[in-house]
Amino acid sequence: MALRFPRFSQGLAQDPTTRRIWFGIATAHDFESHDDITEERLYQNIFASHFGQLAIIFLWTSGNLFHVAWQGNFQSWVQDPLHVRPIAHAIWDPHFGQPAVEAFTRGGALGPVNIAYSGVYQWWYTIGLRTNEDLYTGALFLLFLSAISLIAGWLHLQPKWKPSVSWFKNAESRLNHHLSGLFGVSSLAWTGHLVHVAIPGSRGEYVRWNNFLDVLPHPQGLGPLFTGQWNLYAQNPDSSSHLFGTSQGAGTAILTLLGGFHPQTQSLWLTDMAHHHLAIAFIFLVAGHMYRTNFGIGHSMKDLLEAHIPPGGRLGRGHKGLYDTINNSIHFQLGLALASLGVITSLVAQHMYSLPAYAFIAQDFTTQAALYTHHQYIAGFIMTGAFAHGAIFFIRDYNPEQNEDNVLARMLDHKEAIKSHLSWASLFLGFHTLGLYVHNDVMLAFGTPEKQILIEPIFAQWIQSAHGKTSYGFDVLLSSTNGPAFNAGRSIWLPGWLNAVNENSNSLFLTIGPGDFLVHHAIALGLHTTTLILVKGALDARGSKLMPDKKDFGYSFPCDGPGRGGTCDISAWDAFYLAVFWMLNTIGWVTFYWHWKHITLWQGNVSQFNESSTYLMGWLRDYLWLNSSQLINGYNPFGTNSLSVWAWMFLFGHLVWATGFMFLISWRGYWQELIETLAWAHERTPLANLIRWRDKPVALSIVQARLVGLAHFSVGYIFTYAAFLIASTSGKFG
């Protein structure tokens, strides 16, 4: 018999039912579970797949550049970034008919096009790209990198070029390489690009390979560097009347500490960003020389961790045994990496709007909203993944003997206390926040809005004041006009910071009140509950009170009810599954809050948010209902407008989302019976019965159906909100 899919598992390949296909797909990337896997092949497969991942990323970014150069309007956008709408790419077949063709022909294009809400135009413009030729060059370069990555991935699977296990487990060398080689050198290279290409570009000087060696980025060249007069590089910065991309009002400084925003572009000063990247480069280049490799100098990670034993015995044996535990578990390493990346992605969301780095992006409201929402959802998925792999670590890799009485073992020892504290925090936040919202709802319904319970967030306002926001009237730190910090700030450091904090047109330290206080606690409820589910799933992965022997059941077993001995103290997979719903819910609140607050800020009617956000009906009526009207009118009896694609996506998103419930709220036996009925009818129908299948059709397993339901729920949820977000924002601000 020919080898059947999946080749990596002979047991599955011989399964006579359709389970073979679904389980094969589900375990295709679980290299550890494959038949003849060795530790060495496991590491080599993962290493090679990283190159494949890089190749896909480079190909994708190359495609962005290529399509904008081919079908976009980058050159005309550069002439007038505030009034020309950036085009992402052409649309082949706008739906439906001539009205749609006319509706989607915009941005100065000859035919129907999609508008770009990704911010790439602003990014490319800021870093010095100006022409379609520049974009094509970038696309070709990235295509070349993509090919190189593919070749490298293939090469490292060849016997001669396969790295050994010892190479993969050489943590110090990897740390040095990543700190110095990746972060340090790339930050230094980026500083170089900003200083040599982007900053001259922002001052109307076009630097390319042909004049790269002739144009001095600073009038004094490298002189100040060698004579120690570094302050000369900060003198004569761009003036507040500087027109970006021209020499009008431009200075000569390349590394500054101005603070605040460029008045015309509303983005951070390029010279501040160059300075920032130079500092980062310096720190990481130093950090990458700290660990002991071939030369016998520097720190040993293992020695550092073994020495970390807190005094007084309060944390037992501290970090003893952690080095080998982490270094020998790829799930632990992946969990740490995902946790870090998730936090960073969320920080990117928060900083991209409050401290915009790209010229004119702050005035492109739809792009701001899209980027914030995108990065928060990505962060949510990555963070939940961190806990999933933490749970797999406890099941597959954790060795109690190796970790006796260290911080890891002690987490397991007092997990009941951790769970109960998180549970208490979640219950407290949930009941109190809902109680306040519902009370306020009732007061408005009874026509007595003055009886609402409105709490000023005085601690948060105090923190904002300490950073220089004066409108609350706190006389503290940077908002205290006669304090030494305030006066020093005027001249020595970041003179533009205080102006930026107190100018109400940007998103830096938005004024907050009772509505913010309430939604902040609603979000805190979501965060704590999601964390509770995820932490419980990981800490109970090996065993729990009701089911002490989970380890041999593996990561994902179904809840089978009490009939077969009872596995209803859920599997670690089940915890991940439940947590994703909470994660989506929480980020829903986060994005609703961000979007509504900003819509009212951009429209100049902040009182709408302040007055309506203190009760639930306000959110439903004045945010969701009010802002969905343009969207729902994408198609109407009079024809089609340019929001019709979002109206369609909004409907389609609801469809996908609702389909999820078919898999989530259902009995497996119902599907099994339905499938057998259909198979029976098929086999007895003329013509149809000529077509046979090799695998006996069976219903999805409980875990599989949950996964399919979860995938539909997530995708539909995000499609629906993305359509709402883009249509409601672009419908208002064009």
UniProtKB/Swiss-Prot annotation:
The gene is psaB. Chlorophyll a B1 binds at H654. It is a multi-pass membrane protein. The PsaA/B heterodimer binds the P700 chlorophyll special pair and subsequent electron acceptors. PSI consists of a core antenna complex that captures photons, and an electron transfer chain that converts photonic excitation into a charge separation. The eukaryotic PSI reaction center is composed of at least 11 subunits. This is Photosystem I P700 chlorophyll a apoprotein A2. NCBIfam families: psaB. Belongs to the PsaA/PsaB family. It comes from the Eukaryota. Chlorophyll a B3 binds at M662, Y670. One of its GO terms (molecular function) is oxidoreductase activity. It catalyses: reduced [plastocyanin] + hnu + oxidized [2Fe-2S]-[ferredoxin] = oxidized [plastocyanin] + reduced [2Fe-2S]-[ferredoxin]. The keyword Transmembrane applies. Keywords: 4Fe-4S, Chlorophyll, Chloroplast, Chromophore, Electron transport, Iron, Iron-sulfur, Magnesium, Membrane, Metal-binding, Oxidoreductase, Photosynthesis, Photosystem I, Plastid, Thylakoid, Transmembrane, Transmembrane helix, Transport. GO terms for biological process: photosynthesis. PsaA and PsaB bind P700, the primary electron donor of photosystem I (PSI), as well as the electron acceptors A0, A1 and FX. PSI is a plastocyanin-ferredoxin oxidoreductase, converting photonic excitation into a charge separation, which transfers an electron from the donor P700 chlorophyll pair to the spectroscopically characterized acceptors A0, A1, FX, FA and FB in turn. Oxidized P700 is reduced on the lumenal side of the thylakoid membrane by plastocyanin. [4Fe-4S] cluster binds at C559, C568. InterPro entries: PSI_PsaA/B, PSI_PsaA/B_CS, PSI_PsaA/B_sf, PSI_PsaB. Its EC number is 1.97.1.12. GO terms for cellular component: chloroplast thylakoid membrane; photosystem I. SUPFAM superfamilies: Photosystem I subunits PsaA/PsaB (SSF81558). It is found in: Plastid, Chloroplast thylakoid membrane.
